[in-house]
C-alpha cells in the first residue's frame, strides 16, 4: 500500500496512486482523518469509529482501510447520520 494511504487499481490489477479523492475507493484511517480537516477528528477518533463499526471498512492485506466508495454510495442514498454498529454486518 502506498505511504499516502490511498491507492487505486488499474484494469489489469496494477496498483496506482490516486490523486483525486472524489474517486478513491479506499483510504487509510490517517488519511481519512486528514481529509475531514477538523481539529477534533484525529486518527484516534477515526480508529474508534472503525472499532465501533460506525464507518464502513475493508480489510486489504493486514490493514483495515476506510471504504470511501461505500460512504459515498450511502450519502447518495440519503444517509446523513452514522451511528455505532451501522456497519456491523461488514
Curated annotation (Swiss-Prot):
It comes from the Viruses. This is 10.1 kDa protein. It comes from Pseudomonas phage Pf1. The lineage of its organism: Viruses, Monodnaviria, Loebvirae, Hofneiviricota, Faserviricetes.
Amino acid at each position: 500500500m502506498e505511504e499516502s494511504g490511498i491507492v487505486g487499481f488499474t484494469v489489469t490489477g496494477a496498483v496506482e496512486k490516486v490523486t483525486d479523492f472524489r474517486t478513491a475507493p479506499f483510504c487509510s484511517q490517517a488519511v481519512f482523518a486528514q481529509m475531514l480537516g477538523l481539529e477534533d477528528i484525529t486518527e484516534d477518533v477515526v480508529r474508534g469509529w472503525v472499532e465501533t463499526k460506525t464507518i464502513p471498512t475493508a480489510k486489504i492485506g493486514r490493514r483495515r482501510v476506510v471504504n470511501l466508495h461505500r460512504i459515498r454510495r450511502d450519502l447518495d442514498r440519503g444517509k446523513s447520520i452514522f451511528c455505532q454498529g451501522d456497519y456491523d454486518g461488514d
